[in-house]
C-alpha cells in the first residue's frame, strides 16, 4: 500500500496493490464501504496517472517542478532578481524533494539569497504568504518551487513590502 499524494503528487488517497486473492479478502471487509474513495478522487488520480504515463508534466505542477532543468530554474530566479528592489544574490543550491517516497532526494536548484537578518526576513516574507528557508545564515527563496506564472506576483509582493529598502 502507498499514499497517492506522496508518491504521485496527486489527490489524497491510499492505494492497495497485491495478489488478487488478498485484494478479494479486503473487499469483503465491512470497513471498505466507509473507507472507499469517491468518483471525483478516482477521476483525479486517473488523470495524474495518465499524465505520468504520457510524460505530460504540464498537467501536474509537482511533476513540472521536479522535471524542470536547473537552467530553467536559474532563468526564473534571474528574471525575478532583475525586478526585485530588495538586495539579493543568485546562488546555486539543492532542493529537498521530501515527502514519504523521497525524503532525502535532492535536485539541483537556484535560490535568491536576501541580505539582512535571516529570521526577521523570513517572518516578513511569511506574512506575505511567501515561504522560503534559511540556508547558510541567509533567508533564501528556492526557485525550483516557483511556477513561471507566479514570478510577477512574487516580485510585486516583495517590492510592495520593502519599498525603498534596496
Can you annotate each of these PLM segments?
Residues 1-81:
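Active-site C-terminal subdomain of aminotransferase-like
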Residues 33, 52-56, 87, 128-132, ...:
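Short secondary-structure junctions and interdomain/linker hinges
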Residues 74-149:
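Conserved C-terminal alpha-helix-loop-beta "cap" of PLP-dependent enzymes
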Residues 150-157:
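Charge-rich, low-aromatic oligomerization/scaffolding segments with amphipathic character
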Residues 160-166:
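Generic C-terminal helix-cap and adjacent flexible tail
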